[in-house]
Design a protein with these regions (language model features):
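Residues at secondary-structure transition points
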Residues: 12, 41-48, 52, 105, ...
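N-terminal single-pass transmembrane signal-anchor helix
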Residues: 10-38
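Periplasmic/extracellular, small/polar-rich flexible segments of pilin-like filament-forming proteins
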Residues: 2, 66-152
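Membrane-proximal N-terminal amphipathic helix
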Residues: 42-70
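N-terminal secretory signal peptides that target proteins for export/translocation
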Residues: 1-10
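Phosphate-coordinating loops and pocket residues in cytosolic domains that bind phosphorylated ligands
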Residues: 35, 40, 73-76
Length: 152
């Protein structure tokens, strides 16, 4: 039986070098465009974790006040209340991105601070340290950006 179409010789299939380089160039452009957005999202996520850790530390301070009727220790030589181990860093497990501490306390007030770990992923963050006081007033230190930008 005769074929109506003559058979072409079998051609090797695969990718040419030009096609591979084109794909690599497209992937490089996509990575260059998407990485800054990813890094911004990651910083926001770490900052949100630190904000949640500050709220947890604030609840701890409220429980301390309920038990002792004051936010400080009552000892003039060591007035600041130390936060227990799970509350003194953000995230609670793994490598710390922020250190959570009581930076000011007296009988009727306190200020909590979330300070980026030096040489950590949040060290170059423009928001600097996040603060929270007994009235849940939010603040930032060591930066020129607004509180609203950092406490989203």
């Amino acid at each position: 039986m005769r074929h109506l179409h003559p058979r072409l010789p079998h051609r090797l299939t695969g990718f040419t070098l030009v096609e591979m380089l084109t794909v690599l160039a497209v992937l490089g452009v996509l990575a260059a465009v998407s990485y800054p957005s990813y890094a911004t999202h990651l910083h926001r996520a770490h900052r949100a974790d630190a904000q949640a850790a500050l709220m947890d530390a604030a609840f701890f301070m409220q429980r301390h006040y309920a038990a002792h009727h004051r936010y400080d220790t009552g000892d003039a030589s060591a007035p600041l209340v130390g936060l227990p181990a799970p509350l003194n860093q953000s995230p609670r497990q793994g490598t710390a991105h922020y250190l959570i501490s009581v930076t000011q306390a007296d009988a009727g007030s306190y200020t909590l601070s979330a300070t980026p770990v030096s040489h950590g992923p949040m060290a170059p963050d423009t928001c600097g340290s996040l603060t929270l006081n007994q009235h849940h007033a939010r603040g930032i230190t060591g930066t020129t950006v607004s509180v609203a930008q950092c406490w989203r």
